[in-house]
Amino acid sequence: MTLTMNEAIQLILDFRYVPVGYWKDIPIEDPLVCQFIKEGYATLDAEHQEKYVLSDKGADFLHTYIERISTTFIEFLKKKQLSCHDTDAIHWFSETYSLDNETSESLYDYISFNLKVYGYKRQKFHQTEYGWGCQFEKIDE
């Protein structure tokens, strides 16, 4: 399965961001999600058989895209001395991946929380008229 970055972002947010997955009893109209499930990237949850969640295969598959997005975002942060406002980061996601504001905000929330996997963490330190100021810092692995 080959995805555009925007398709990958959609699936990342569908399967990695709240609410995670798709309910079995609600018809899935999105052909991309149907294909993703059909190819075994998502399966019914072992505990809750009524919901499709990522399989190990799907997690590995999406990780490639998550890593690419995270690495690119870290480079953006390094150019800003690891400090920026939420609104700047959301705008960056919007511009970089041609996303609407809501999708950009969700992706920023997910990626910035997940940066600990790549050795960084986010700390909100003050609120201004431009949003929360955030400091990202390198953490020991």
Which residues does each predicted region cover?
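Amphipathic alpha-helical segments in structured regions that serve as interaction surfaces
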Residues: T72-F76, D86-Y97, S104-L115
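Accessory beta->alpha helical hairpin/"wing" motif in late/C-terminal subdomains of nucleic-acid enzymes
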Residues: E47-T64, T128
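Short amphipathic alpha-helical interaction segments
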Residues: W23-E39, N101-Y110
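Short amphipathic alpha-helical interface segments
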Residues: M1-P31, R68-W92
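A short, conserved structural fragment
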Residues: I37-E47, L115-H126
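C-terminal engagement modules used by replication, chromatin/transcription, nuclear envelope/ESCRT
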Residues: Q127-E141
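Short intrinsically disordered terminal tails
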Residues: M1-L3, E95, K138-E141
